[in-house]
């Protein structure tokens, strides 16, 4: 029984997020999804649980204009705690990105949120320009902070999606508990 409790405590310590590294969001633009139409707004919200003040969100944007020889890449880091005012200006070091894409080109946004082994992938058709903003929100549990990153992209057709992504270590804890129970059962079986 003592071995089981030690293994359980060790498993809980390992499953606890240690200075979790935030997600990288990569947005790529492809050719076939763009159709010229009235500009619409696409809003994607990602809620993510952060446990450390040094954690940041890294976003890089690849833009391919109508001519394939002139790719542009814009990237920035959003440290935790930075906020935006009115969706235009940023406090501290955050920069708002806006990218104009020709009517011939198209955009395909692929967002990959990675936390440990968990991946969430979104495919959002085409965009002609966009901006990102981040608003920190306190959560009910003391040490964990909840931040919301909102990306608005003007697109050729309307596609409104809201995706909230909150990461917990419940899956890891259940895995550790199951493996510890199995190990405890095997150890008790060997003693017989």
Swiss-Prot record:
One of its GO terms (cellular component) is extracellular region. GO terms for molecular function: nucleic acid binding. Glycans are attached at residues 47, 104. Residues 21-54 are annotated as: Disordered. Its main location: secreted. Keywords: Glycoprotein, Secreted, Signal. Residues 43-54 have a biased composition (Polar residues). It comes from the Eukaryota. Residues 1-15 form the signal peptide. It is found in: Secreted. Belongs to the pancreatic ribonuclease family. This is Putative inactive ribonuclease 11. The gene is Rnase11.
